[in-house]
Amino acid sequence: MDSHMNNLLKWSIENSVPAQPDDPEQVKQERSLDRLDTQALQRLLSNAPSDADLMKAAMEVVSDDFATLENKLIAFDNFEQLIENLDNANNMGVLGLWTPLVEALSDAEPQMRKMAAWCIGTAVQNNEMAQNKLLDFKAVPKLLSLAKTDPDTTVRRKAIYALSSAVRNHQPSLDELQKLLPADYVSEGEKMNAADMDRIDAIMNKLKEIPA
């Protein structure tokens, strides 16, 4: 650490405990503030990574063949928390993060498939832009397959969560799902409505009832 950063760190530690109003040390602290190297402070703040940087870094770990499963899952968890923010979820397309995320649905490790479905569900929930992206990447068939046939129950549940989030109030996604559902899920001639929450709940509950 250079001398400017050292001075900044020392000042921040000294000022972490406020002095009493009539404490003579107060004068010293106020003077130290005046002497603070503002350039060092700017460098410290500018070095903080943006959410976009953190998202890309997390997905790089997820996609790294040499990363441990533990580190991949930690990265996935961090990624999921970041995309709870609507703007971050919408930036996934610009950052090129949808491709590796959808690919992770086919990972051999169940925990990775689960986290991929979880992240998709978080990204598309009440988010038309992300719902459109999911359609662009043709992920609805894969999610339905996981929901119906994955041998891991936790993967099935997260896939159902992702489907549920994808189709609510998004008619194109629901139309895509309806085309793929077995005949006993939809009445002949029925046109499901993406705004009909009860009907969507019924579909999701039926998927949950499929035996493992």
Swiss-Prot record:
Residue ranges of ARM repeats: 26-67, 86-125, 128-168
InterPro entries hit by this protein: ARM-like, ARM-type_fold, Hsp70_NEF-Inhibitors, Nucleotide_exch_fac_Fes1
Subcellular location(s) per record: Cytoplasm
Transmembrane segments: none
Pfam family, one: Fes1
SUPFAM superfamilies: ARM repeat (SSF48371)
Keyword vocabulary terms for this entry: Cytoplasm, Repeat, Translation regulation
One GO process term, biological-process aspect: regulation of translation
Record-level GO cellular component terms: endoplasmic reticulum
Disulfide bonds: none
Molecular function (Gene Ontology), one example: adenyl-nucleotide exchange factor activity
Role description: Functions as a nucleotide exchange factor (NEF) for Hsp70 chaperones which accelerates the release of ADP. Required for fully efficient Hsp70-mediated folding of proteins.
Listed PANTHER family: HSP70-BINDING PROTEIN 1 (PTHR19316:SF18), PROTEIN FOLDING REGULATOR (PTHR19316)
Family statement drawn from the similarity comment of this UniProt entry: Belongs to the FES1 family.
This protein's name: Hsp70 nucleotide exchange factor FES1
